[in-house]
UniProtKB/Swiss-Prot annotation:
Name of the encoding gene: aff-1
Phenotype when the gene is knocked out: Egg laying defective phenotype. AC fail to fuse in the majority of worms. RNAi-mediated knockdown in a daf-7 e1372 mutant background causes a severe defect in amphid sheath cell fusion induced by entry into dauer stage.
Protein family: Belongs to the EFF/AFF cell fusogen family.
Protein purpose: Required for cell fusion events during development including the fusion of anchor cells (AC), vulval A and vulval D rings, and late epidermal seam cells. Required for amphid sheath cell fusion induced by entry into dauer stage.
Tissue: Expressed in amphid sheath cells.
Keyword Transmembrane in annotation: yes
Cystine crosslinks: none
Membrane keyword on record: yes
Cytoplasmic compartment residues: 559-589
InterPro entries: Fusogen_EFF/AFF (IPR029213), Fusogen_EFF/AFF_dom3 (IPR043076)
Protein name (record): Cell fusion protein aff-1
Length: 589
């Protein structure tokens, strides 16, 4: 063979070898960094070791075991490659399951009152008969108001009564119904059961592309013991040892409630337990079977009722329920923002699910709890980690109404793990706070709420760096600080004005007179009872004009008619002084 033929053959061999190497390198790079659309690898091993142990409990055979340790965070993944297969373990979520001890249905009531006043000593028909309105009697209910109680007030101000030296008496019907037809469910929660849910998936290299061949299979790990061990046996044998503690952030044990039209809208506040009937808390107006009731046959509500009679004959009154909250009295507004704090507003709550059929409420934790994982395999695994990215971020630091100090951050173009550090100024001498956040497998815009210590009370220089990226990739900016005022509990219900129409024959049995026909002219009590708007002041002005006119008319009548008539009847000369003076002047001539 000639020299040039040898040269061509050698060149062809070199080209083939180079192409094969490039092909192998290309496949390897595709697995390591570029082809993670199907899965994401976020955790790096912090330790690897090899030792000998008996893998089979019924065998004395000793084999070589490879152990790999990881620190594992919520929403993150661990990837190990054994031969041509990639095992992916993902920390899916942390669930807190709260058993429901007991429950009841309640409503915020709308209350209306019908009060009648009876003047002492007038009328044979006593509408405020003590036997009829005794405190242990219920009044007639209706389809509109399913609950009704009576209240007898033996001594009230006798305004507009003929006898004002003796107190009048008032009798009231207190009617209740669910406000806007809305009903709520109160539940008592016990201490939670904490479960860590992880998933296992398997990917295999098929013609240079990673394809899912198994999973995801979920495993529920109870954190009560703090340690768990199990095995994965598909394709390869992997022994998993997991150590994790229960999260510190959880709902307190006690009473919660939710609207019946939205079970997952769990709320917290001052709520009566099933054995309580405190009018200062939610849940004192309850449904028992098909009836709506106030505990103790409404005795507490009756005792809380206060009434002021503004006009006994006009049946005008003002009333309120002292020491009672969480109701709507006729003509008043109900402000429920202070009691209706949603559980989902807590920074550690990702979602809420209420399942009354299983008597359980599940909270998916926002932060999770850190775990230490040890994977034992028969062969040494190849480890890989995906690239973390961050395009930009914005945020704010807030001290909210309830005293929670939070860093609210919106991340743009984020994937994987990012490290957050906060400084007093841009010199970055000492970090005031540091944490890590995970954002899963795909590039996205996402937000996060992070609890901060009480030492942070001003604007901060915040720097965020994607995991395992050079320092030049760090993004820093000033984040403003904002304080919101503390919540102020709503004030007790104000007085509400009511009018109870009553026929003359039924109430007080007084004959109609000028005062009844024209109460705005002759009755100041009516004016005081109905308020002092422009119309009432106009009426009182007309009253004054008429009174002045009547006074002038009486003066004229007295001086021009009554006095001369009296003088004439008593034979007393009554002559005008001007006439006497004129007569005297004429005699001088």
């Amino acid at each position: 063979m000639r020299l040039w033929q040898w040269s061509i053959a050698v060149a062809i061999c070199l080209v083939m070898v180079t192409e094969a190497r490039l092909r192998r390198h290309h496949r390897k790079r595709r697995f390591v960094s570029s082809n993670f659309d199907e899965f994401y690898c976020g955790e790096s091993a912090h330790a690897q070791s090899q030792f000998e142990e008996e893998r089979e409990s019924n065998s004395s055979k000793v084999s070589s075991v490879h152990s790999t340790q990881f620190n594992w965070g919520l929403d993150n993944t661990i990837c190990i490659k054994l031969q041509n297969v990639v095992h992916v373990l993902k920390y899916e979520r942390l669930e807190q399951r709260y058993p429901i001890e007991n429950s009841y249905t309640f409503s915020v009531p709308l209350i209306d009152t019908n009060c009648k006043c009876h003047c002492y000593g007038f009328g044979t028909n006593d509408v405020c008969n003590v036997e009829k309105y005794a405190d242990d009697r219920n009044c007639t209910t209706s389809s509109e108001f399913p609950t009704c109680y009576t209240k007898y007030h033996p001594a009230v101000e006798p305004l507009d009564c003929p006898v004002t030296s003796i107190p009048a008496k008032a009798c009231c019907d207190i009617k209740l119904k669910p406000r806007d037809g809305r009903m709520f469910r109160a539940v008592k929660l016990q201490q939670p059961i904490n479960d860590m849910i992880i998933s296992h998936s398997i990917f295999a290299n098929n013609s240079g592309k990673m394809m899912k061949v198994l999973g995801p299979d979920e495993f529920r790990i109870n954190l009560l013991k703090g340690k768990e061990q199990f095995e994965l046996t598909e394709y390869h044998r992997i022994s998993v040892q997991l150590v994790a503690s229960s999260p510190q952030q959880q709902l307190r044990e006690g009473m919660y409630y939710f609207p019946e039209e939205n079970h997952n809208d769990l709320r917290e506040g001052k709520i009566n337990e099933i054995t309580e009937s405190d009018l200062d808390k939610l849940g004192w107006y309850r449904r028992v079977g098909n009836d709506w009731q106030v505990a103790t046959s409404g005795l507490l509500l009756r005792n809380a009722h206060k009434v002021v009679i503004k006009n006994c004959k006009g049946q005008v009154h003002m009333d309120q329920f002292s020491g009672t909250k969480n109701f709507v009295l006729r003509g008043t507004q109900y402000n429920d923002t202070y009691n209706e704090r949603r559980v989902s507003d807590n920074n550690f709550v990702r979602s809420v699910k209420v399942d009354e059929s299983s008597r359980e409420i599940t909270i998916v934790h926002e932060h999770g709890t850190a775990a230490q994982v040890s994977l034992k395999t028969d062969t040494r695994p190849n480890l890989t980690k995906s690239q973390s990215l961050l395009a930009n971020f914005t945020g704010s630091i807030t001290l909210d109404h309830d005293g929670n100090r939070m860093l609210n951050v919106t991340f743009f173009g984020v994937k994987g793990t990012v490290h957050i550090k906060m400084y007093v100024n841009d010199r970055k001498l000492i970090a005031t706070f540091a944490c890590t956040a995970q954002f899963g497998t795909s590039l996205k815009d996402d937000g996060s709420r992070i609890s901060l210590p009480s030492t942070i009370n001003q604007a901060q220089w915040v720097c965020i760096l994607p995991d395992e990226q050079p320092t030049k990739s760090e993004i820093c900016k000033w984040i403003p600080y904002e304080e919101k005022a503390m919540r102020t509990p709503r004030q007790e219900q104000s007085w509400s004005k009511g009018h109870s129409p009553c026929s003359q024959a039924e109430c007080n049995s007084l004959k109609s007179g000028v005062s009844d026909l024209f109460p705005w002219i002759m009755n100041f009590d009516y004016f005081m009872a109905h308020g002092g708007d422009f119309t009432e002041w106009l009426k009182i002005g007309i009253h004054i004009v008429i009174a002045v006119g009547l006074l002038l008319l009486l003066i004229l009548l007295f001086t021009k008619c009554l006095v001369p008539l009296a003088c004439c009847s008593l034979s007393i000369p009554f002559k005008n002084r001007n006439k006497k003076k004129k007569k005297k002047n004429s005699s001088d001539y």
